[in-house]
């Protein structure tokens, strides 16, 4: 096993997580779902999946709302008879005491800072435009959605610029190694061009994306 992999998986055991393998309720087109699969892959953890088509309303059925998530959203990580929504919470659960979470308390806070940034400044803009343009289609957008596009484009570019400035001075978002912050931000950054964002404008992000893809046990998004 490579030294990097030993460090990441140190102290991890699937039996410490759950009696049975965790199950990810997901749509494979979702970057939020992909984060969880990438975390499990880097840690060498087994992860079953159950797939839903969000465009077909499969997460809004009475059965899903009653048994998986009353909010009608995915991803949801099922651990034995418990259900954990929110992608970054699920990644945190899987990573536990592995090296994907820094041991230093300030570094942990920095990691969380970037994970909050991803959910508040990055994902609402970049992921939303990707969904609207790549899956829904510009012609199918409502007038309200079309009116929001410019603001989301500007905010998404601002988020990418912040990331690029940060990565100009370092290889990873926190410390000297990959962490959950990198996984959280990779998911929708590497698909940003599907939302009309030009990643060629951000060379430090481009180099970081290559480093992520070169990690042992990396898996691509389906």
Predicted feature residues:
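GST-like fold's C-terminal all-alpha helical module
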Residues: 115-211
């Amino acid at each position: 096993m490579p030294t990097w992999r030993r460090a990441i998986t140190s102290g991890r055991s699937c039996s410490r997580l759950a009696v049975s393998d965790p199950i990810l309720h997901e749509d494979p087109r979702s970057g939020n779902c992909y984060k969880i699969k990438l975390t499990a892959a880097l840690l060498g953890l087994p992860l079953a999946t159950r797939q839903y088509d969000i465009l077909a309303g499969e997460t809004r059925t009475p059965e899903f709302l009653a048994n998986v998530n009353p909010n009608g959203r995915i991803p949801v990580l099922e651990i034995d008879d418990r259900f954990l929504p929110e992608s970054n919470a699920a990644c945190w659960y899987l990573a536990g005491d592995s090296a994907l979470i820094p041991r230093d308390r300030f570094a942990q806070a920095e990691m969380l800072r970037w994970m909050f940034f991803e959910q508040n400044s990055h994902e609402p803009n970049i992921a939303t435009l990707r969904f609207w343009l790549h899956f829904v289609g510009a012609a199918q957008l409502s007038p309200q959605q079309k009116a929001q596009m410019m603001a989301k484009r500007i905010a998404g570019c601002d988020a990418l610029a912040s990331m690029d400035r940060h990565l100009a001075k370092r290889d990873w978002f926190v410390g000297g190694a990959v962490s959950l912050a990198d996984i959280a931000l990779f998911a929708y950054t590497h698909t940003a061009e599907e939302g009309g964002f030009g990643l060629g404008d951000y060379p430090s992000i481009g180099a970081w994306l290559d480093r992520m893809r070169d990690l042992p046990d990396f898996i691509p998004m389906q």
